[in-house]
Amino acid sequence: MNATILGQAIAFVIFVWFCMKYVWPPLMAAIEKRQKEISDGLASAERAKKDLDLAQANATDQLKKAKAEAQVIIEQANKRRSQILDEAKAEAEQERTKIVAQAQAEIDAERKRAREELRKQVAILAVAGAEKIIERSVDEAANSDIVDKLVAEL
């Protein structure tokens, strides 16, 4: 064998041993460190994605709850509005009934007063008619006619 080839082989073996002993471990450590950083970054991104999904789900739930609460509040407000309107209508109806009753009472009182006034006037007319009958002293048939007319007027 040739001494040059043997020298090259020994130099190559020493070079490989040197690389394996001093160069390869720092390279592997750097590669492993980089792999760990990438792995940690991916895990962190995955956690962030899960957190984002969870936050979105929570936000959606809270939005649904808020909408439901708003709907309940709106329904309660509508019920209260209807109740207030019904109360106002009932109150207005009572007031109308009261006013109508007062007006009817006033009308009845006025009607009664007018009848009393009319009776007084009829009595005055009856007295005046009786005076005329007495003054004229007409026959019995004429007196009957006058009395019948007075009765008809009453």
UniProtKB/Swiss-Prot annotation:
It holds the Pfam family ATP-synt_B. The chain crosses the membrane at residues 9-29. Keywords: ATP synthesis, Cell inner membrane, Cell membrane, CF(0), Hydrogen ion transport, Ion transport, Membrane, Transmembrane, Transmembrane helix, Transport. One of its GO terms (cellular component) is plasma membrane. Disulfide bonds: none annotated. InterPro entries: ATP_synth_B-like_membr_sf, ATP_synth_b/b'su_bac/chlpt, ATP_synth_F0_bsu_bac, ATP_synthase_B_chain. It is found in: Cell inner membrane. It is a single-pass membrane protein. Belongs to the ATPase B chain family. HAMAP family: ATP_synth_b_bprime. This is ATP synthase subunit b. It comes from Klebsiella pneumoniae subsp. pneumoniae (strain ATCC 700721 / MGH 78578). The gene is atpF.
